[in-house]
Amino acid sequence: MKIGIINTKIRTVFSAFACMIAASLVCTMPARAVVEININKGVIEPLPIAITDFLSADQLGSNITSVIAADLERSGLFAPIDKGAFIEKISNPDAAPRFEDWKVINAQALVTGRITKQPDGRLKAEFHLWDTFGGQQMIGQQFFTTPDNWRRVAHIIADAIYERLTGDKGYFDTRVVFVDESGPAQKRVKRLAIMDQDGANVRFISDGRALSLTPRFSPNRQEVTYMSFEGGSPKVYLLQLETGQRELVGNFPGMTIAPRFSPDGQKVVMSLLQDDGSANIYTMDLRNRTTTRLTSSQAIDTGASYSPDGSQIVFTSDRGGRPQLYVMGADGSNPRRISMGDGSYSTPVWSPRGDLIAFTKQSQGQFSIGVTKTDGSGERLLTSGFHNEGPTWAPNGRVLMFFRKAAGAGGPKLFTIDLTGRNERQIQTPNFASDPAWSPLLE
């Protein structure tokens, strides 16, 4: 079975910001825009926003508009207004709209745009973000790309709108690597796959002949590390997405599990299972293939995840009796327990913002996804149920993705949830899905 490998090498497919802040596109603005979202104040009311169909010679403009609206709505911060309520029909997206028509339907912000095909076959995508109550333009940008990248253009535009109105980077122009699960429960086939963050453009990167688990992106998005049972014993592998080349990470005599990259992409941290049933944490330097042991205990130390600055590692250990969260220096120094609640903890992952650690918690017959400050204080459970597991952070540290299995028949599915715990959404995938890992923003 031939597997298509994704080319994630950074390419110049977009010519962005060509007209940003150009006099023909951007109006004079005060230092502070009237419309904005305070993303830091907890639960907020979604901002009503009107997103008009981008003008185009075919259905593409409407398709791009739908993706933008879906991205923004799924974040929980925006409430796209039904197009049936629109009063003004936009015929020239470059011209100032009739702001009164949009204020009548309480559109706090307005998006207009156009898609045109260039003589060289590329697409030109233009959009404008308007502050309707302030009566001014907030953004005017244009992008050039190939027709097959139209969905990515939509995600980039959604990111620009998100950032302008919240002050935070967006997370829509990203991918997720995960485990696709198909077939009956007794003969489940698990393949590694990559998709856009909204579930579109699924591509398989393994054939399912060997059980593969816990895939994780490298910081440059060009590699994936994962665990495979090829040969019968779990080992950690490194896969080059552009070429499909694969190599074993560390020639350890025992089983290696739970791999993850360091923030600079130069190391992989993982756990090595010992003959006595214990597991210790090691790193392998990808530059010279040297390995370093970080923990030495009779316990099971696993699930290591670096802080974004690379100075610390959070991991799970049962050295105190049951699995709890610990933090140590990146060299293995000064390990200290940070979780003090009831239950067992697993799959910790440090936020890209550096302020929180997400985890899975098992307590009182339920599996929960939660977050805690890096010193263990302020623990909050965001969602609980029969089986929730494996949180992964969006690159802006505002949203988590995880997998859930309901009681009874069936298999796991992917969900996202924000830090309020109120905005939970299922991500549609072709089959059952587990073990998601979010990529950094694409470039």
UniProtKB/Swiss-Prot annotation:
A GO-annotated cellular component: periplasmic space
BP terms from Gene Ontology: cell division; protein import
Keywords, comma-separated and alphabetical: Cell cycle, Cell division, Periplasm, Signal
InterPro entries cross-referenced by the UniProt entry: 6-blade_b-propeller_TolB-like, PD40, Tol-Pal_TolB, TolB_N
Signal peptide range: 1-33
SUPFAM superfamilies named in the record: TolB, N-terminal domain, Tricorn protease N-terminal domain
Subcellular location: Periplasm
One family name in Pfam for this protein: TolB_N
Family affiliation: Belongs to the TolB family.
NCBIfam families recorded: propeller_TolB (TIGR02800)
Subunit text: The Tol-Pal system is composed of five core proteins: the inner membrane proteins TolA, TolQ and TolR, the periplasmic protein TolB and the outer membrane protein Pal. They form a network linking the inner and outer membranes and the peptidoglycan layer.
Biological role stated in the UniProt entry: Part of the Tol-Pal system, which plays a role in outer membrane invagination during cell division and is important for maintaining outer membrane integrity.
Name used for this protein in its record: Tol-Pal system protein TolB
Record organism: Brucella suis (strain ATCC 23445 / NCTC 10510)
Name of the encoding gene: tolB
